[in-house]
Regions:
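Extracytoplasmic gate region of multi-pass secondary transporters
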Residues: 29-33, 148, 152, 229-274, ...
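Helix-to-loop junctions at the C-terminal end of transmembrane segments
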Residues: 61-73, 280-293, 382-383
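Cytoplasmic membrane-interface "Motif A"-like loop-to-helix N-cap segments
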Residues: 71-82, 289-303
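Glycine-rich segments within core transmembrane alpha-helices of 12-TM secondary carriers
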Residues: 135-164, 364-375
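C-terminal membrane-cytosol helix-exit motif in multi-pass small-molecule transporters
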Residues: 155-164, 186-209, 408-412
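Flexible cytoplasmic inter-helical loops of multi-pass small-molecule transporters
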Residues: 199-220, 419-427
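A late C-terminal transmembrane helix in Major Facilitator Superfamily
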Residues: 350-386
């Protein structure tokens, strides 16, 4: 096989695609959650049910999309996913009713997962063979965070410009919809354009591409992955880490409900937090040669647990801005470091590169199950218990998952930290 060589723009385009595909279903609602609730005339539970619909479709997509990604080129699957996802933005901009919104989220569950998720992880592992896995996933996660933050900043500026009201804390429905519509349409154009960039610029040598694409997926190959202990531990690790990432969706709402920010200020605050994601992930990548990534994963869960506890105690109130900011920073370090690490440990777990898509699909079946239940559960707490009480329940829930993830990460570290990694490109016939 030829030596691995990638164009300098391979990783930047992969990073750009990796976040752009989730702008419409996730990033906008994370930054503009209070606005999304208003313009679609829904509550937190109903928004959570939309995410559940996404999650249920995504679960099936993980299972069947994983093997598909081992059969076809990541470039082709990812570019198609981005184009199809952008079409959903045209529907989103029409502000469909609750049931229409659920159908749309189900559609996005297919386009962003079946066609995109496993191919993206496989492409990152592929690129990481020329460097290290921690650097590959650290740069991917950090870059994705930077892309999300920049697009979020643009979105907030567009929203504030078109809102055009003197008191932006209480815009009426028509004003909010008019401003948010421009944000959605701009986002849709960006997603479609990135799809073109992926198709055009993520090409690799055909001989190299064939080395990581299987001619057919057999049941024996799937069984080979299913019976790896690392796959089962990664299911738990990813699930617990992902709950933390989902909880970041309520940061802007916490700023509005508890810290008494207005709509624009809460969106600006949520966007500011997005800039912590690349800072933390890239810092993790820079420590890759000094620390075991499995050990860093253990520390990440410990920090996430500490941050969640601070919020669950109910001591972070309107008058304690410094405590609010420092606690957010602690929690962000834990959550975002975990995002940069959990797929980087696949190589230590002896998961072969040609079967990455299948492995990611199986891991994600449980790992991303919070897409189904965590949204409605958070929505229930936030709607039933007004103000800080509802948020306390949400963060208490996160502390439990962080603790479970902590022990799963310790187990993974104990099993694999001293074992020599197998070659990613070894033959599996």
């Amino acid at each position: 096989m030829k030596p691995l060589k990638f164009s300098w723009y391979f990783l930047p385009v992969l990073i750009l695609a990796g976040e752009s595909v989730f702008i419409l279903p996730y990033v906008l609602s994370r930054i503009f959650r209070p606005t999304v609730l208003q313009v679609f005339q829904i509550n937190n539970v109903e928004l959570g049910l939309c995410f559940s619909t996404y999650g249920m479709v995504a679960i099936l997509s993980y299972v069947f999309g994983g093997p598909i990604s081992d059969r076809y080129s990541p470039r082709k699957l990812m570019s198609l996913a981005l184009i199809l996802t952008s079409f959903g933005g045209l529907v989103y901009a029409q502000f469909p009713g609750f049931y229409g919104l659920k159908i749309l989220y189900g559609y996005w569950g297919f386009t962003t997962v079946f066609l995109f998720w496993s191919p993206m992880i496989k492409a990152a592992r592929f690129w990481g063979k020329t460097s290290t896995q921690v650097k590959a996933f650290g740069f991917l996660e950090g870059g994705r965070g930077l892309v999300g933050a920049l697009i979020g900043t643009i979105g907030v500026l567009v929203f504030a410009y078109f809102l055009n009201v003197s008191d932006s804390k209480f815009p009426n429905l028509e004003q909010s919809r008019n401003a948010f519509k421009y944000v959605v349409l701009l986002s849709s154009v960006i997603v479609a354009f990135v799809g073109f960039l992926v198709w055009k610029f993520m090409k690799v040598d055909q001989e190299i591409e064939k080395s990581v694409v299987l001619e057919k997926i057999s049941l024996n190959k799937i069984k080979e992955v299913v019976f790896l202990p690392s796959v089962w531990l990664l299911m738990v690790i990813v699930m617990c880490a992902y709950v933390g990432y989902k909880v970041t969706d309520v940061f802007s709402l916490y700023a509005l409900d508890v810290m008494q920010y207005n709509q624009v200020d809460s969106a600006e605050f949520a966007t500011f937090l997005l800039y912590l994601r690349p800072l933390i992930a890239i810092s993790i990548a820079s420590f890759a040669s000094r620390w075991e990534n499995t050990l860093m994963l253990v520390i990440g869960f410990a920090v996430s647990f500490l941050g969640a506890l601070l919020f669950s105690f109910g001591i972070i109130t309107y008058s304690k801005t410094l405590l609010f900011l420092s606690s957010i920073f602690i929690l962000a370090i834990g959550v975002y470091s975990l995002r940069a690490l959990y797929f980087s440990i696949m190589e230590k777990g002896e998961i072969p590169l040609p079967l990455t898509g299948t492995a990611v699909g199986i891991i994600s079946l449980i790992g991303y199950a919070p897409d189904i239940f965590i949204g409605p559960l958070m929505g229930y707490f936030l709607d039933k218990y007004n103000g800080i009480i509802g948020h306390q329940y949400v963060f208490a829930l996160l502390s439990v998952f962080s603790l479970v993830g902590f022990f799963a990460a310790i187990k993974y570290h104990a099993i694999y930290c001293n074992e020599a990694s197998h070659s990613l490109f070894e033959s599996h016939e």
